[in-house]
C-alpha cells in the first residue's frame, strides 16, 4: 500500500514547521511513506482540499496532519489502524460539546466517495464558510446523520488534542493526550509561543 502524509506549511509558521516536520519525516522514512509539505496559506489549504485528489492519483491512502501536530509513537503504521474506515476517517475531538470532530488528523483512502467529499467541500464553500469551525463543523453534522463516506474514530485514536483555552473546556471525557497516545495535537493551546514550547517538551517523549 502506498501512503503519503500531507501537512500544510507556510512562511508565517516557519518556526513551527521547522520543529514539527522532522518528526513527520522520521515517521515516514521508518514506515516507507512519502511526506508532502504543501506550502500554501492556511486559508487556501482549507478551502481547496479538492487538490488532495491529485495526490490520490498516486497514493492509496493520504494522512493529512496539521503542522502543529506531532507523532508521539513512531512504532505504529497508520495504515494498519483498525479504526480506519473504507473512505474517510476522522477522530472525535473532546474539547467542547458543540464541536464533535477535529480534522487536524484525517485519513483519506483512494475511493470515489472520498474524492467526491473533497470536491464537495471545495465546491460548496457557502455551506460551511459561516460555521463556527468551517467544514469541520459541516463534517460533524454529516457524521450525526450517518453518511457512509465518513468513519468517526474514537477519542485519541490517531488525534489526541491538547488545550488551555477555552478555560471552561475541562477534560471531562478523556480527550486530552495521554502517555502512549499516537498523535499530540495542541490545537487549543494559546498563545502560539506557548504552543511551540509545549511541542518542544513533548518531542522529548516520543516513543521509538
Where are these regions (language model features)?
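N-terminal anchoring/stem segment of glycosyltransferases
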Residues: 1-59, 112, 190-191, 207-208
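Catalytic core and acceptor-binding pocket of nucleotide-sugar-dependent glycosyltransferases
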Residues: 45-46, 50, 112-208
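Loop/turn elements at helix/coil->beta-strand transitions in domains of secreted/extracellular proteins
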Residues: 2, 32-33, 67, 86, ...
Amino acid at each position: 500500500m502506498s501512503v503519503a502524509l500531507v501537512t500544510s506549511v507556510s512562511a508565517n509558521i516557519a518556526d513551527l514547521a521547522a520543529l514539527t516536520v522532522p518528526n513527520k519525516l522520521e515517521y515516514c522514512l521508518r514506515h516507507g511513506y512519502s511526506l508532502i509539505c504543501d506550502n500554501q496559506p492556511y486559508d487556501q489549504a482549507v478551502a481547496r482540499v479538492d487538490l488532495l485528489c491529485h495526490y490520490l492519483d498516486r497514493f492509496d491512502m493520504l494522512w493529512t496532519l496539521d503542522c502543529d501536530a506531532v507523532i508521539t509513537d513512531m512504532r505504529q503504521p497508520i495504515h494498519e489502524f483498525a479504526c480506519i474506515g473504507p473512505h474517510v476517517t476522522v477522530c472525535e475531538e473532546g474539547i467542547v460539546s458543540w464541536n464533535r470532530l477535529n480534522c487536524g488528523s484525517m485519513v483519506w483512502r483512494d475511493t470515489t466517495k472520498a474524492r467526491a467529499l473533497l470536491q464537495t467541500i471545495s465546491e460548496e464553500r457557502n455551506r460551511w464558510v459561516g460555521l463556527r469551525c468551517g467544514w469541520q463543523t459541516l463534517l460533524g453534522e454529516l457524521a450525526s446523520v450517518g453518511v457512509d463516506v465518513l468513519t468517526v474514530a474514537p477519542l485519541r485514536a490517531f488525534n489526541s488534542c491538547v488545550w488551555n483555552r477555552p478555560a471552561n473546556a475541562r477534560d471531562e471525557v478523556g480527550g486530552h493526550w495521554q502517555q502512549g497516545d499516537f498523535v499530540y495535537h495542541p490545537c487549543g493551546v494559546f498563545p502560539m509561543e506557548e504552543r511551540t514550547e509545549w511541542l518542544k517538551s513533548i518531542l522529548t517523549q516520543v516513543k521509538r
